[in-house]
């Protein structure tokens, strides 16, 4: 119904609507989701549905704003394939992105915007032949595919990690954890440890249960079985909520104050005055302190919520896709901040599909697949 909504408003023939919807679903690899309720889908799956809706509209121009955000590598490949098909069909395709690697060989022109104006323009070939030093000086994300999750931690540490999800002296841990939505099992028998002083990244395909796992860990969702412990002792949902700071995937749902400075004090009353100003400065937000949080860009909202999580000084900090909508400079800033939080003794848990980010910060990587976990 969602894919056909636009065409229905234009009174198109039902047979045409069915054909357009089926074609868009096939292009985006969501045919198996067509009978699912939107409320049951993961953030990445919803992103693919939104793109399929745009494809099914039949419009001659497609504007895609951060289409790769929240998507796993396979889903990004689906997006690339769909954009290529539209290009071959003669449509005008405009993509606004920070994650640039998947558009290599596809983009015909690349425009760099700064301060509301076009600063530079390249042909696709010239842009993707840019040297690494030049790329970084322009504040651009990597132009090279960061590879599969298994390569992320290896590329940072120069060696493979231990093939185990368990460690000694874990700050947060789960044993035989199970979670179901009605008769749908998300995961079962899951064992994992999250040590203090380290950054643990959780990867996996869209719909594998990553967001569900962190919601269960921090006490926002009730697992159907198993035990979750803090510092080696079983902890109730209330205890976990008090110990965890969570940055959700949809940051707009975590903004409540009428100023950025006020946002910091909601969970940390001492984040005022110079302390609050310094925290905003650390995230390049000091010049926006009097702005209403909901007036910020997506990347600015992301950084504000991370700053608010840091202000709480809680022993467990959980972030769900913290680098969506973030450029290279701010990605480096978030990486450095998470490293400081971990060095101060917190267990940092990050759900991410962003290989560039994970390769820069992850000490450990846990890869989820439906109904199982591997390290």
Where are the regions that the model predicts?
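Conserved ABC ATPase "signature" region
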Residues: 16-33, 273-288
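Conserved ABC ATPase signature
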Residues: 37-41, 292-296, 300
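Hydrophobic anchor residue at the start of the ABC signature
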Residues: 51, 306-307
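ABC ATPase C-loop
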Residues: 55, 309-310
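Catalytic Walker B motif of ABC-type/P-loop ATPase nucleotide-binding domains
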Residues: 62-65, 317-320
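H-loop/switch region of ABC-family ATPase nucleotide-binding domains
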Residues: 97-98, 352-353
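Helix-to-loop junction immediately C-terminal to a conserved catalytic motif
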Residues: 218
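Conserved ABC transporter NBD signature motif
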Residues: 226-240
